[in-house]
Amino acid sequence: EVYGKVTPADLKGKVVLVSLFATWCGPCQKELAEVEKTLYPSYKGNMDFRLLVIGREHTDADLKKYNERKKFTFPLYPDPKREVFSLFADQSIPRAYLFDKEGKLVYSASGYSPEEFQQLLKAIEKALK
């Protein structure tokens, strides 16, 4: 796998952002560009935060090829059979789910807009306090 496996133990006690996307989704591309530009640089060194960007219907090979073009510095995780996606939704991307350190869902969004992304950043800050 491109970035290894993530286990529940890896996430315990951390603020976790699950971002679901597809390589062919226009709004997803805008959101991921913003993740690369603002969100990831701000939080990549924070040991209390985990970012899980999950490619719906994509394999490791798909994501490697995609990231050769995009050059994202954050990890991309495959979900070729929609196993993770199906835990959250049955359609519509991008989707973002933010969980606090206790594992409680504290923010969710479907679709992308700059305003919504700012709300997400505020929710992350609040969850990390």
Predicted regions and their residues:
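A short beta-strand-turn-helix
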Residues: E1-V16
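Short pre-active-site segment immediately N-terminal to redox-active cysteine/selenocysteine motifs
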Residues: K14-V16, F21-W24, S92
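A conserved nucleotide-sugar
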Residues: N46-L51
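Thiol-/selenol-based redox modules, centered on thioredoxin-like
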Residues: L98-K129
